[in-house]
């Protein structure tokens, strides 16, 4: 399942990631990561599927001052920009059918490279149409989502990572047993024997429940770790079978994009290193 956030004007992708399930927590995770990387936005516009209208998502965004609007049922034209982006996803999946990909991690690694090197940097027809509709000339080479995003003069508003993290935390009540433990989602967690019999408030990230924060009045929060492995624990999920029905050795297109991606990162690292050297050189002559 692919979850994506797209900037309405520039068509720039704020976050896009494949997950092994289609749940509300996946959408929350996408919002969380997009806000951390690109800052707070004023308003979000989502589908009306149940995973997009969860109370938790609405509350999390409200805590950060973000208003959520929902598309009306059977109004496909209102989601046109993200639907057109899905055609790009289809192109990627065709390449993935060629590549030898077995894990979700590898799928997302290649997807990030594809986005950064192909979609974000390619001229976008929708941006051209937008400007031409207002009789504004567009360069012959067009304008890419990345270029249009960078042309926006509005200042990005970043929020402290701790504040954002807390906004997306889930909360539930639990009772601590005589051994100082509590159960959650089929696992046991160790809190403290001093809380035996107490009703506590737990806070957790639904996509990472290896550690859960336990809150009790008059005490510092406790980080409770999982102490038992449930029988239903699973390894990292594989890529959906539908994507890998044909698995040759590699995709030449994705290989080329990855090579360009690595080269750009290397050049950026060299530039930073050279800049640091120049500063040291200048300081040495002062």
Residues of each region from the PLM?
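Active-site-proximal acidic segments at structured loop/helix or strand boundaries
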Residues: 91-189
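Protein C-terminal end segments and domain termini
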Residues: 174-286
């Amino acid at each position: 399942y692919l979850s994506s956030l797209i900037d309405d004007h520039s068509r720039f992708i704020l976050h896009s990631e494949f997950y092994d399930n289609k749940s509300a927590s996946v959408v929350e995770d996408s919002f969380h990561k997009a806000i951390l990387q690109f800052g707070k936005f004023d308003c979000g516009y989502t589908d009306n599927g149940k995973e997009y209208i969860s109370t938790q998502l609405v509350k999390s965004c409200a805590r950060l001052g973000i208003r959520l609007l929902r598309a009306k049922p059977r109004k496909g034209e209102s989601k046109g920009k993200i639907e057109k982006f899905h055609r790009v996803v289809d192109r990627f999946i065709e390449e993935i059918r060629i590549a030898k990909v077995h894990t979700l991690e590898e799928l997302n690694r290649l997807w990030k490279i594809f986005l950064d090197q192909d979609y974000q940097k390619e001229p976008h027809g929708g941006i051209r149409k937008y400007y031409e509709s207002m009789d504004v000339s567009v360069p012959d080479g067009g304008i890419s989502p990345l270029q249009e995003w960078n042309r926006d003069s509005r200042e990005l508003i970043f929020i402290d990572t701790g504040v954002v993290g807390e906004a997306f935390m889930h909360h539930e009540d639990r009772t601590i047993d005589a051994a100082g433990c509590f159960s959650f989602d089929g696992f046991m967690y160790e809190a403290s024997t001093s809380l035996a019999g107490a009703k506590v408030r737990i806070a957790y990230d639904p996509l990472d429940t290896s550690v859960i924060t336990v809150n009790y009045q008059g005490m510092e929060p406790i980080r409770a770790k999982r102490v038992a492995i449930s029988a239903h624990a699973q390894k990292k999920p594989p890529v959906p079978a539908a994507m890998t029905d044909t698995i040759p050795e590699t995709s030449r297109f994705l290989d080329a994009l990855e090579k360009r991606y690595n080269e750009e990162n290397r050049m950026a690292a060299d530039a930073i290193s050279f800049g640091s050297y120049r500063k040291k050189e200048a300081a040495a002559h002062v």
